[in-house]
């Protein structure tokens, strides 16, 4: 079913406003971590402190092509460094929404890297598995080139996780109380499927009387083989035995999962209705509690669980979709999906209806891309009321 846009925005705002300020659900997020360096490629050095930049990717490409068979030297200037990685960005957004967050990832060797200092100040607890990965983002007027140094992600293993948290007992303590758990960036974290399998076999059985929400972000699985994707989806089925798995996808990821599962992308009047039907198909095939898809302009979700936090109410089976909060000239786009995921998971942790959680996710992302800042719950509610008119 689709929902009238303004009414849904108002209902989502009211649901957020009804959450007491003292309500702070616990969340655990892992396991990646990146330092993103934003870099200029110098065209002309004018002085020690002044230079002009290479304006476009095409200009840089022409210079590189001209150097073939010869050699060339390019000066790179780091303008600033910022927090990166699906986990840290999502964790930071959850903190802004008032959650008590434990962030686990490759956040620093021996000491937490300074780029993660704002997250370390806001989170309840930080657990580092090693030095962060690095992305060099060369920015131009017509786009950006991102060069990743991913070797540190090899430190994200089940054995290293055990060592960092104090063994099996420590890992059980880590997962015993959070209302929401998020394990993200599966594509780059090559051992994450194995970690899920160990958790399902050795840690989760008998651990809790309740079923936490377990958010999954595959993060561009096109880079992985079909066999790897199917193995990951099978591991999620094992996690589902002990938790309500929330599979979060963007449109490209949703289409790829449909392809891997031999499902046909639906034809519908609107993009969000097509995505809603796709979410229903994927959820029914995988037998997960939730499958959510956020598109550039809209979003959709399918569920089969009593969504109210008390499990005493809430439709146990359904789907929803809605138009979103697209803006022509965003201030920032990197991290927009992570913010949507944080807002959506926050809503679910508060027992808010999934259709309204879509708009809370959209408002969280919408505020972020317009301001480059993670919104509070109150700011997300204001955004929703403004959107409703």
Task: Please annotate each region the language model reported.
Residues 1-70, 75-86, 96-319, 325-327, ...:
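Ribokinase/PfkB-type carbohydrate-kinase core domain
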Residues 86-89, 341:
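Short glycine/serine/threonine-rich phosphate/pyrophosphate-binding segments
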Residues 92-96, 346-350, 363-370:
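Short glycine/serine- and small hydrophobic-enriched flexible loop segments
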């Amino acid at each position: 079913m689709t929902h009238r846009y303004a009414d849904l925005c108002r209902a989502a705002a009211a649901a957020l406003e009804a959450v007491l300020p003292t309500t702070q659900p616990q969340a655990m997020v892992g396991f990646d971590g990146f330092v993103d360096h934003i870099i200029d490629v110098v065209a002309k050095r004018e002085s020690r402190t002044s230079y002009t930049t290479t304006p476009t990717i095409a200009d840089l490409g022409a210079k590189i092509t001209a150097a073939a068979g010869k050699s060339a030297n390019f000066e790179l200037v780091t303008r600033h460094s910022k927090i990166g990685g699906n986990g840290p960005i999502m964790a930071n957004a959850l903190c802004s929404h008032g959650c008590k967050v434990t962030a686990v990832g490759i956040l620093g060797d021996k000491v937490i890297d300074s780029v993660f200092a704002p997250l370390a100040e806001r989170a309840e607890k930080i657990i580092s598995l090693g030095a962060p990965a690095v992305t060099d983002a060369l920015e131009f007027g017509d786009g950006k080139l991102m060069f990743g140094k991913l070797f540190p992600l090899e430190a994200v293993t089940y054995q290293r996780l055990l060592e960092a948290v104090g063994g099996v007992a420590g890992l059980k303590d880590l997962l015993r109380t959070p209302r929401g758990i998020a394990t993200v960036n599966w594509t780059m974290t090559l051992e994450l499927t194995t970690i899920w399998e160990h958790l399902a076999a050795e840690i989760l059985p008998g651990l809790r009387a309740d079923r936490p929400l377990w958010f999954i972000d595959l993060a561009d699985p096109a880079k992985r083989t079909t066999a790897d994707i199917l193995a990951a989806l099978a591991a999620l089925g094992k996690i589902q035995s002990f938790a309500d798995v929330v599979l979060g996808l963007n449109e490209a990821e949703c289409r790829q999962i449909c392809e891997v599962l031999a499902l046909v992308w639906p034809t519908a009047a609107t993009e969000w209705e097509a995505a809603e039907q796709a979410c229903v198909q994927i959820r029914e095939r995988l037998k997960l509690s939730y499958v959510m898809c956020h598109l550039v302009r809209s979003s959709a979700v399918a569920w089969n669980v009593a969504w109210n936090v008390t499990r005493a109410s809430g439709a146990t089976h359904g789907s929803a979709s809605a138009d979103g909060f697209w803006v022509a000239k965003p201030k920032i786009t990197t991290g927009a999906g992570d913010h949507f995921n944080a807002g959506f998971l926050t809503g679910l942790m508060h027992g808010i209806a999934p259709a309204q959680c879509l708009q809370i996710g959209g408002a969280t992302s919408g505020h972020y891309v317009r301001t480059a800042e993670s919104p509070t719950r109150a700011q997300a509610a204001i955004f929703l009321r403004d959107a409703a008119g």
